[in-house]
């Protein structure tokens, strides 16, 4: 049964008040604070109907009511409908110096978002598959140390310090450096690993044994490109919420943030402008008392990662959606400006 306008206004008021106070709300509170133009008795009857319809819940013996996941969903959907119509300008406070390392830029924005919202933020770094490598270069820093610089087709730069037990002959090193760029750039993932694991030794011939350790180290580093990194910030903000004063509940939340494979799935990119999962809408049991607001960040309209906010279902969705959207838009603009020439 669809909600009429009066029920919608009452439900919106209940959710808004509960987000601010964390206390169950009664009909008299709604009548006094929100100028509904109807009696508290009428509001009480409407709230009883909303409870029967699954939008509100009555905790323990309290006379007041709190929103259910379904009630929060109505609230969020209403916000998102209005939000799409708003003209948002990026916040000037986050435009700072350019940082060369891609991951550090994303981490910095996740930290700023956590500081602004006082919530835990999570960011998914892009999975940089080897078939997206534009250039690979080895830079010697010592006889047994070198930096491997990987540049993707989007211009993202990844640096790896390679520590070797044995030094590599300079002639072998230069030959290998040129060979890698010639054979790897623009090739498919399968072709890259096939070359490194099988063909390279034949190509090197007598020099293969001198470069064996280096080749294995390069292979290991390239395989790390296939692993998605998840970064978290503001983890202790959860302790500021009354819902997490219970020590065991707080420990469970912190354990959840250590589960990178779960967070990796939670942060899978979505087609929606902003995706909000509330309580039991989350498919993981560990997330059933939490809400996740997430959106993607891009380089020149190409999705490269996801950034989100995790917290209790009682969160200020309107403010958090706004802050997340503004921050992600600014992050995308910065990344696009840095890597524009490389795409």
Curated annotation (Swiss-Prot):
Keywords linked to the UniProt accession: Repressor, Stress response, Transcription, Transcription regulation
Write out the similarity annotation: Belongs to the HrcA family.
Is RNA-binding found in the keyword set?
Answer: no
* Pfam families membership: HrcA
Instruction: Supply the InterPro entries for this chain.
Output: GAF-like_dom_sf (IPR029016), HrcA (IPR002571), HrcA_C (IPR021153), WH-like_DNA-bd_sf (IPR036388), WH_DNA-bd_sf (IPR036390), WHTH_transcript_rep_HrcA_IDD (IPR023120)
Function, in words: Negative regulator of class I heat shock genes (grpE-dnaK-dnaJ and groELS operons). Prevents heat-shock induction of these operons.
Q: Which SUPFAM superfamilies does the UniProt record give?
A: GAF domain-like (SSF55781), Winged helix' DNA-binding domain (SSF46785)
Q: Which NCBIfam families match?
A: hrcA
Q: Under which name does UniProt file this protein? A: Heat-inducible transcription repressor HrcA
Q: Which GO terms describe its molecular function?
A: DNA binding
Q: Which domain of life is it from?
A: Bacteria
BP-aspect Gene Ontology terms: negative regulation of DNA-templated transcription
- Which PANTHER family does the record cross-reference, listed alphabetically? HEAT-INDUCIBLE TRANSCRIPTION REPRESSOR HRCA (PTHR34824:SF1)
